[in-house]
Amino acid sequence: MSITAQSVYRDTGNFFRNQFMTILLISLLCAFITVVLGHVFSPSDAQLAQLNDGVPVSGSSGLFDLVQNMSPEQQQILLQASAASTFSGLIGNAILAGGVILIIQLVSAGQRVSALRAIGASAPILPKLFILIFLTTLLVQIGIMLVVVPGIIMAILLALAPVMLVQDKMGVFASMRSSMRLTWANMRLVAPAVLSWLLAKTLLLLFASSFAALTPEIGAVLANTLSNLISAVLLIYLFRLYMLIRQ
């Protein structure tokens, strides 16, 4: 059977509309979890204020130069802030991926579903999803730091891994290998969706500062919720595409 991107887009749009409230609640809940965890593990405001003390920002030629000019205490604060942001984001993304994929599975099986039920049902696979998303994020970030293009290619090749991990109960590395092979064979169907997702995420990041006009916390929750909705659309598309490819 010939698969067209247009038909998968249409199926994705229909599912997203029909399950919008459930997906919105999961996106909001994951955003709240991300913001709360980030706040709990981040350095205090007083510690963050120390990052500006005695650091010649204008004279620094780059990020590494800026970090080298920091005191050991400032470097530790920066590391803690970065780790808190990364950890909270990974937790939120793992719960989002697990919840959205379980929604699709439950709805496809004709069962009634709620946001909490989907998240609860995904609990057993969350540790593997966390490791998978961590490794994927690491590889993509390394690729982007090198010349950008390798990072984008890795994001495309590993896009199907979360779906395969949950749907076929694969291991972390098996799902990554299988995703690379399957995506490479269906690049014309996967690449446009992932590139659109990356573009939407980038645009959201550019306008994220405007959300802080409310309060930093509410703005962060709103920005993360929108980001999660964008990721949910991609997950729905990838799940539908994967099921069609397997037929």
Curated annotation (Swiss-Prot):
It comes from the Bacteria. Keywords: Cell inner membrane, Cell membrane, Membrane, Transmembrane, Transmembrane helix. It holds the Pfam family UPF0259. InterPro entries: UPF0259. The keyword Transmembrane helix applies. The chain crosses the membrane at residues 20-40, 87-107, 118-140, 152-172, 187-209, 225-245. Residues 41-86, 141-151, 210-224 are periplasmic. It is a multi-pass membrane protein. It is found in: Cell inner membrane. GO terms for cellular component: plasma membrane. Residues 1-19, 108-117, 173-186, 246-247 are cytoplasmic. Belongs to the UPF0259 family. HAMAP family: UPF0259 (MF_01067). This is UPF0259 membrane protein YciC. It comes from Escherichia coli O6:H1 (strain CFT073 / ATCC 700928 / UPEC). The gene is yciC.
